[in-house]
Amino acid sequence: MERDFDLGMGRPGGLGGLGGEPIMQQMPQPAPHHPSRSSNDHNVKNLMKQAEENSGYLTLQGNRRKADLKELQFVEDIGHGSCGTVTKCRYKSVIMAVKTMPRTSNSYEMSRILMDLDVICLSFDCPYIVRCFGYFITNFDVRVCMECMATCLDRLLIRIKQPIPERIIGKLSVSIIKALHYLKTKHQIMHRDVKPSNILLDWSGVIKLCDFGIAGRLIESRAHSKQAGCPLYMGPERLDPNNFDSYDIRSDVWSFGVTLVELATGQYPYAGTEFDMMSKILNDEPPRLDPAKFSPDFCQLVESCLQRDPTMRPNYDMLLQHPFVVHHEKIETDVEEWFADVMGECG
């Protein structure tokens, strides 16, 4: 399973999730300006020192213990990307996924790694975000030990060669909206890279959000950097070169809507070169679901998320109250059984 390691600029300030045991209080607000390269280098070095103090500890079954990197036993490769690799490893009796990212002198890349670490450690109490057991920082790399999931949704679509049923997407929607809502309400964090490759599924049917390297700290509920994220899932307001305004979580709502269309149809809704696709996002009417194939509530949910004007899109509280989401939160859907069936069909 190939994984997409999109890593982005971290926020200024302390490492709320890396400063020892998990903490519940909100982190300090960052200064509302872009630091110079030299100040950012200094900031990254300080944050790395904080992180190093808690390197080598794993929290397993509620117990935090000092661990030796040598005790991690390699099992198999899971995937790789331009910025790192993921392997399946065993620590004593626990199977885990270990994401290894090289340490570099590039403060931009290191701030991304630190951001990913920070968010995943902060989110220890959220059942909809992939769980982190701990991490190891060496002179050469950073290794993050996480729960081992079965696959990500983009690789699943490629493997099963068919769309994901609406009833399964309903359960996926509940989990992802709750994960995004948690990040916003509890930590004032915006994911900024919502897409199928960052949604994980395990064999028990549990759905979780991952990859927080380019998440952004919100200042008065708004984000200011427009570079972060995969452009093919960005809202028009983030792609428009003439738009210099900040944006809010409703940009992630657009990304969520595009993801829903891709899962429901089995393919990304725009065609052509990357330039062509970005041009269509900016200029064409947003994609819609075929009402002959999907329920009215599902079609309306997608339509509400994919509004060109971001102020017309719902926020997370509104999404959680949407009839499609409310319905699928209440009903029982055997995601585990469906997943086992489709994986069995494709060998």
From Swiss-Prot:
GO terms under biological process: determination of adult lifespan; JNK cascade; male meiotic nuclear division; MAPK cascade; oocyte development; p38MAPK cascade; positive regulation of axon extension involved in regeneration; regulation of growth rate
Record text on activity regulation: May be activated by phosphorylation at Ser-221 and Ser-225.
Cleavable signal peptide: none
Result of altering residue 225 to E: Phosphomimetic mutant which probably causes constitutive kinase activation. Loss of pharyngeal muscle contraction and egg laying. Formation of vacuoles in the pharynx and uterus lumen
One Gene Ontology term, aspect cellular component: cytoplasm
Post-translational modification (record): May be phosphorylated at Ser-221 and/or Ser-225 by mlk-1.
Keywords, ordered alphabetically: ATP-binding, Kinase, Magnesium, Metal-binding, Nucleotide-binding, Phosphoprotein, Serine/threonine-protein kinase, Stress response, Transferase, Tyrosine-protein kinase
UniProt modified residues of type Phosphoserine: 221, 225
GO molecular function, one term: protein tyrosine kinase activity
Tissue specificity comment: Expressed in pharyngeal muscles, uterine endothelial cells, intestine and in neurons of ring ganglia, ventral ganglion and ganglia around anus. Expressed also in hypodermis and body muscles.
Residue positions binding ATP: 78-86, 99
Region entry Disordered, spans: 1-42
Residue span, Protein kinase domain: 72-325
Cofactor(s) this protein requires: Mg(2+)
Active-site residues, as the UniProt record annotates them: 193
Listed EC numbers: 2.7.12.2
Reaction equations catalysed: L-seryl-[protein] + ATP = O-phospho-L-seryl-[protein] + ADP + H(+); L-threonyl-[protein] + ATP = O-phospho-L-threonyl-[protein] + ADP + H(+); L-tyrosyl-[protein] + ATP = O-phospho-L-tyrosyl-[protein] + ADP + H(+)
Highest taxon of the lineage: Eukaryota
Gene ablation phenotype (knockout): Loss of kgb-1 activation. Hypersensitivity to high concentrations of copper (> 50 microM) and cadmium (>5 microM) and to food starvation which is characterized by a failure for most animals to reach adulthood. The few surviving adults appear starved and are defective in egg laying and are infertile. In addition, have moderate susceptibility to pathogenic bacteria infection characterized by a shorter lifespan and a substantial decrease in pmk-1 phosphorylation. In absence of stress, animals have no obvious phenotype.
SMART domains: S_TKc
InterPro entries reported for this sequence: Dual_spec_MAPK_kinase, Kinase-like_dom_sf, Prot_kinase_dom, Ser/Thr_kinase_AS
Residue ranges with Gly residues bias: 10-20
Record note on quaternary structure: Interacts with shc-1; the interaction is independent of mek-1 catalytic activity, is constitutive and may facilitate mlk-1-mediated phosphorylation by bringing mlk-1 and mek-1 together.
Family named by the database record: Belongs to the protein kinase superfamily. STE Ser/Thr protein kinase family. MAP kinase kinase subfamily.
Biological role: Dual specificity protein kinase which may phosphorylate kgb-1 and thereby is an essential component of the JNK pathway composed of mlk-1, mek-1 and kgb-1. May also have a synergistic role with sek-1 in phosphorylating pmk-1. Involved in the response to environmental stress including heavy metal ions (Cu(2+) and Cd(2+)), oxidative stress and starvation. In association with sek-1, regulates germline cell apoptosis in response to oxidative, osmotic and heat shock stresses. Involved in resistance to pathogenic bacteria infection. Involved in axon regeneration after injury.
Protein name: Dual specificity mitogen-activated protein kinase kinase mek-1
Organism encoding this protein: Caenorhabditis elegans
Source lineage: Eukaryota, Metazoa, Ecdysozoa, Nematoda, Chromadorea
This protein's encoding gene: mek-1
